[in-house]
Amino acid sequence: MERTKDKRLEELFESGVPVYSISRLDCINRCLAEAYETYINNNRGESNIYALCGSKVHDVLEGIVNGENTETDLLPAVEKELEEAEMLGYEFPKMPDGSDGIRTKWVNDMQHFCATYKSPNPKNLSTEKLFIYKSPKGNVLQGYIDLQKKNEDGSIDIYDYKTSSLYTGSNIKEHGRQLVVYQMGLEQAGETVRSVSWIFLKYVEIRFMGKKTVKSKEKTEISKVVERCKIGYEMAKYVEQVMIEQGFDEVDIDVALTEFKQSNSFSVLPESVSIEFKMLPYVCKYEVTDEVKQECEEYIDKTIEMWESLGDDESNYPPLKFTKIQKNGKEVSDIFYCTKLCSHGKTCKYLHDYLDKLDNGTKDEFDDLF
């Protein structure tokens, strides 16, 4: 959706102050060649199917909160965007065996999300809120917050929609910086931020009463985070236990579990069973400590200082490494991002030069992209 112009940003631009975004800084740290093409040559390149469909989901969710869309608009909008993207040649990556498993999982996850989405009470919610943040060294960042909630005590909860897989390892800190900047930006504007969170749309949190271990004597509340397309298989053993306790016979249990695994829906189960399980959106909080803020501030200032020192010479902007070292010490190609996600993958001279040196097996992988 189109954003309205903000006087604060216009004043910064008119005064010649460089205004960055966290996504721009991430691009600079990921691949200088990509950043050079995008931000110096002002060439945005091509999108990818994840970005196109993800943006559509964001737009409709924003429209629902603002009263411009309803829950029933979600699924048709996503399916139409997916169809149009594929007609234009955008594709999901293939599995190693050449199958469409990645596409199938993503589509199943998002279809389940769209079909089960319940809109929140729009009271005290706002979308696409602009923030402007000034770092300790005076560098300026701007961005827009997907969703924020004003609490009764005046504090704010920040939410960021994600259609990606869960973050793990170092990815948590890397992606967490976006939430940290959101919080610091609002705090500079005088707000009190209570929490920052991701809402991972491909996942659900399922709560139910059960025994956590085989040695447990009492039932306690169990919470499991499950990918939507795997609900049936991941939760089958817990559903089976409930049905056994409620006295269902073996045949009825087998029939119910088969349908449950196929549908990934608790609604196909007997009501006495389904009410034992509560399915919620997966809201993943990110803890923002003083140390986390300091790391983010240093990341911002060091990245911008490095970027502004490079000048206009293209040779100062090398590409990311096209290989990685495995645990066994073997060097292998590592070009998934370049061929599937980068906006300049099809035109990158560095990638073309690298692939020209590879054997036919890897070159075939590249040819599949184009």
Model segments located where?
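RecB-family 4Fe-4S metal-dependent nuclease core
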Residues: 1-370
